[in-house]
Amino acid sequence: ALNFDPNTQEVDAKLASQTVWLDAYITNVDRTFRNTNLLLWHKELWLIDHGAAFYFHHSWDTWEKHAMSPFALIKDHVLLPQATLIEEVNAEFQTLLTNEKLKTIVDLLPDDWLNWEGNEQTPDEIRAIYYQFLVLRKSHAATFVNQAQHARATLI
């Protein structure tokens, strides 16, 4: 696998828009020109290292505020210049990511990932917060989609 280099490699508008939408949705602050966290493997783009996503989990008390935020840091996304189809992707992902599907995904989180020193919540309580975050964030997707489109317009 090779590191993705935005100066020498291109991503089509659909994939760029899907990636920008996903990163705005999960509030991933770590896919920038300095650190793309993208690999090319057999001519396919792979998204790696989502450790900086869901940054609300550093302050559990504010998860609802983060779920409704515009996510201003999307302005630094490495694929934002190519992401011309964000509205189309939003419509597609709104249909694809049903609440039932989100619940299934969140239920797959292992208990070991949800237990850490100083944590007073059970894994099921933490899963419930992640699920609620994802559902609320999806219902407010227009906020982060508009933010991404505005940020993209300032680049052009």
Predicted segment positions?
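Phosphate/dinucleotide-binding and metal-coordinating scaffold of catalytic cores
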Residues: A1-I156
